[in-house]
Amino acid sequence: MILNASGCLDALEAPDVARALDAFVTKTVTPLPREGNRPVRIAETEAGMLNSIGLENPGIESLLAEKLPRLAELGVPLWVSVGGFAASEYAELCAVLDDRPEVTAIELN
């Protein structure tokens, strides 16, 4: 199975790439919007790259209202990546997404 890493592909900006995958994984979403970390977010090292974006995202309500319907139109299985700071936040997100027929799987970040 070939899929993207969460946050590495905007399927709405590159739909042909997303459609070529076996499944598309969304950028991680949290219960509330997050601005993420201040720059510098990415550093190159001899061993590779390090990143610490800080889970910047618009929150679950925005994902459900704005992005999820458009992502479902791509016709590729949709995995939603969720993040939280407590087990209850993960449970809340999973419960909301479990009721959505367009969501094929949930990734815990």
Q: What is each model feature region?
A:
Residues E73, A87-N109:
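Alpha/beta enzyme core
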